[in-house]
């Protein structure tokens, strides 16, 4: 998980995303007008509620991710916490790659006037990213295909 700045016509907002390392699928995301931890906690809670708990959860060492509100959610769920080395962007390369894609294919092409407009447009892009954008690292599969292909199949009764 990580967050990044999103420039707007006037000012900027912050975009946080939880990414599955295996499939590169964005599991949850949030926009915020502040850097407070709450929007990161919300994205984390959504990812855990909708996709279950991973064995390990990785972030950088930002205050949003080291505070009790955030780490408490992971500890309560029994998830091991992993943090990148200071300034070591390569430790979270899959999220950094997402930021490059979302910025160059969506954000930098727009000048959002409102937070609502940014939320709608970024949401549309992330749905495209998960469902229709193939990745060479995934053997030309989309993140959705890679994510759902690895889940165990249940037989119909």
What are these regions (language model features)?
Residues 1-157:
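Charged DNA-binding/catalytic regions of mobile-element recombinases
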């Amino acid at each position: 998980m990580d967050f990044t700045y999103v420039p707007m016509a006037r000012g900027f907002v912050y975009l946080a995303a939880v990414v599955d390392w295996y499939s590169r699928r964005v599991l949850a995301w949030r926009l915020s007008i502040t850097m407070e931890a709450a929007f990161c906690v919300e994205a984390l809670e959504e990812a855990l509620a909708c996709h279950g708990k991973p064995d390990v959860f990785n972030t950088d060492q930002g205050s949003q991710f080291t505070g009790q509100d955030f780490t408490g959610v992971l500890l309560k769920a029994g998830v091991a916490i992993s943090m990148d080395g200071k300034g070591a962007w390569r430790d979270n390369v899959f999220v950094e790659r997402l930021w490059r894609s979302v910025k160059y294919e969506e954000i930098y092409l727009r000048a959002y006037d409102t937070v609502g407009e940014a939320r709608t447009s970024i949401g549309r892009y992330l749905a495209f990213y998960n469902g229709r954008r193939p990745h060479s690292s995934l053997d030309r599969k989309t993140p959705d295909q890679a994510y759902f292909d690895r889940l165990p199949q249940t037989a119909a009764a």
